Amino acid sequence: MATKGRWSRLWVDDFDMSTKTASAEVSMSIATEEVTAFQATAKEFITTDPESSIKITGYVSNIGNNAGGWEQELHDRFGAANTSQVGLMLADSATGDAGMPTYVLPATSVDEDKISAPASGVLGINGSFMAGDYGLRRGICLWYGSVTGTGNKTSFDIGAAGSAGGDVYVWVFSITGGATNASIKVQSATTSGGSYSDEATVTFSAVGGFTAAMTGAISQWLRVNIASMGGASAISLAVVAAVDGVTQPA
């Protein structure tokens, strides 16, 4: 049975744009160019760099200044430096976020921004985030929601161990009570109930998108550890881990 796209989620830096997005499209392609020259016995081609993007269609639900609406957030990132972190999580249920594949543009900006204003309809918007400086990454969502204290979250089996490191991506949407050096760890173990080792730590004192590298061997079971709330009473965030050679090509 086909899976509904309605449970997908879209994150842009410190904004959860899920309820303002009508559709999203992940695009990946590898082009070739003909390089046939004299003396060639057949046509010759080379493979060029891969290209990728995340395109969105959404609604202009709020046009107030700094209100987190699509109109301003796309415009602010149009042709800007590649500093935005965008993630598209594909989910198969309303609450089953952990373990869901998530496509991440770690350092991107907007290269297309279209607004429609029909007299008899709603304000609509179309935009595209380009590959940016680090291309497209595929990871697994380990946590999405609010945390109110330190401790471990449920572990998840990523299917195999990795040997070439990877990256952790964190989106912090809101902080209640303020935070100073709050920290989130991603840990791994060979079994669900095994001994966990720290693979990466992300520290933050404000909302936004953050990343940290994982190096070397990474075990098959991953979990999020809320190491410090930084003085906050609640933090809303999403955590994604991309393991080279497991969740994406090495």
What role is predicted for each listed range?
Residues 1-63, 98-130, 135-139, 144-146, ...:
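Solvent-exposed edge beta-strands and adjacent loop segments
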Residues 62-65, 173-181, 229-234:
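Extended, low-complexity, turn-rich repeat/linker tracts enriched in Gly/Pro/Ser/Thr and Asp/Glu
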Residues 65-111:
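Short, acidic/charged, Gly/Pro-enriched secondary-structure junctions
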Residues 122, 165-170, 216-238:
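Noncatalytic modules at the cell exterior or secretory-pathway interfaces
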Residues 125-127, 138-140, 230-247:
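Edge beta-strands of jelly-roll/beta-sandwich modules across compartments, strongly enriched
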Residues 154-158, 208-216:
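Exposed aromatic-hydrophobic patches
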Residues 183-187, 240:
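Beta-strand signatures of extracellular beta-sandwich domains
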Residues 197-207:
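Solvent-exposed serine/threonine-rich low-complexity stretches and specific carbohydrate-binding patches
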